[in-house]
């Protein structure tokens, strides 16, 4: 599935129709113009073979996040959330190295730990995955709480709290409040697996 996401320097909608041509099973787009181009192409097409499905929505990013949340809610996988100012990726890799020797384990690829990376990580989890390690980063207040609302971690690990990205947070207190949201999420999950770890 190709999600046509927008960024500061790109617009995935520009590649949506190309993705279908190259075999994508589906495209999710929030561009009226691209949807109209798709419909026009479908009308003109004389091929009997159908291409992938085009989903037109109000916001492609929100659709990605909602789909990830839906997928997470269907999983029985134990989700371990990791946050902190530094050391998230190293901690994730160390934990993955240990757990994957005994369990079918999935982990965030690289440091894809934001509002796009966390949903992509969740969507990569298969039904037979026993443990998933989800890295969660933040550069502004409220971001960890939002990521937790999607990932619903059973366990939380906080590596440390420093002053990196303080320009987005404005104060150390805001950083602490934001990072603490991981623990609040785990505590409020009422999961029988709930555990919290602080470095």
Where are these regions (language model features)?
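Short, basic phosphate-binding NTP loop
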Residues: 1-81, 90-101, 123
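Phosphate-binding loop of NTP-binding sites
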Residues: 56, 62-198
